[in-house]
């Protein structure tokens, strides 16, 4: 199930980059779409960050976790609520944040941050 959650978040990043290109935020001749995945472990947690240079997030970003709410032309608005539920079922947290400016890009995209507890062999 976690695989599905991560794939959905990466797919959202790619779709956001495509929208940024269509809307003129990314100039095909000067910049390119980027999805960056970073994984860090600290204490008893693993933090996965997915950063993109797509269109970014709306001001009411938390509404995206509500069923049937979407900012895309296509889709049902169920992806992020399901992703959040999967992560929470694994005792984790999901945050959507404004992204950082990436190399060759004049705007900020979005950042999805997933924090999950680690499991050691004694817990299995």
Residue ranges and their predicted role:
Residues 7-8, 12-15:
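Conserved polar catalytic motif of the HATPase_c/GHKL fold
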Residues 14-43, 99-106:
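ATP-lid-like helix-loop hinge signature
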Residues 52:
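Acidic ATP/Mg2+-coordinating residue in the GHKL
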Residues 2-3:
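A residue-level detector for a conserved hydrophobic packing site
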Residues 92-93, 99:
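Conserved glycine-rich
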Residues 57-68:
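Short conserved segment of the HATPase_c
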Residues 79, 83:
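Short alpha-helical Gxxx[C/S/T] motif in the catalytic ATP-binding
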